[in-house]
């Protein structure tokens, strides 16, 4: 299906933000993703849906290879062939009053749509995000704009707690009764070891 680019801008480091106009009627849950076809590349690129409305989707992506490099050069009103939506997404029907959202790197992206979905149910989640450094921290301002408590961790200590998402969670002293997490495999494994409550995991 064809989607029209209406915005494609650089955020920081290797991260870009792209907004597209097209059919979003199939998107039913936060945490779903799309597969993007890029001219000259055999494989489609899987990218998490950051946010969506009745006619647009918002994607945050890192430039890590030929396909995403080509995406970063595209301008409105170019079109992309996209399979949308894919994946099971997060189940927000799980009873929870004090959930925490835990994101690492570009895995932060789908948690934004998740935060908005929870808020629409009257639930105010806490947000804990981890990055390599202050320069690579992305999208945290979106959660701040929602009025949510946001706790940060960076490996080099340049922003927030020095260390990882798990360190920032412990330092924040949050009393969460459920968690949702998206990020790299090592982060998710660490969370499974330290989180005292059950939750849902999604690979970035």
Language model feature labels by segment:
Residues 2-78:
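Ferredoxin-reductase
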Residues 66-204:
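FNR/FR-type flavoprotein reductase catalytic core
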């Amino acid at each position: 299906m064809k989607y029209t680019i209406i915005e494609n801008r650089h955020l920081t480091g290797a991260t870009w933000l792209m907004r597209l106009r097209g059919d979003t009627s199939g998107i039913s849950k936060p945490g779903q993703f799309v597969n993007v076809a890029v001219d000259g590349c055999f494989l489609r690129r899987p990218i998490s849906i950051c946010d969506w409305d009745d006619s647009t989707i918002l994607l945050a992506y890192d430039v890590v290879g030929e396909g995403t490099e080509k995406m970063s050069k595209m301008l409105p009103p170019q079109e992309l062939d996209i399979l949308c939506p894919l994946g099971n997404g997060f189940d927000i029907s799980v009873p929870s009053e004090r959930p925490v959202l835990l994101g690492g790197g570009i895995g932060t992206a789908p948690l934004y749509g998740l935060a908005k979905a929870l808020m629409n149910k009257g639930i105010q989640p806490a947000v804990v995000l981890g990055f390599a450094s202050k320069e690579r921290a992305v999208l945290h301002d979106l959660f701040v704009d929602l009025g949510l408590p946001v706790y940060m961790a960076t490996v080099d200590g340049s922003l927030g707690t020095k260390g990882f998402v798990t360190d920032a969670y412990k330092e924040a002293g949050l009393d969460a009764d459920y968690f949702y997490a998206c990020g790299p495999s090592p982060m998710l494994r660490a969370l499974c070891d330290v989180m005292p409550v059950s939750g849902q995991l999604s690979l970035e």
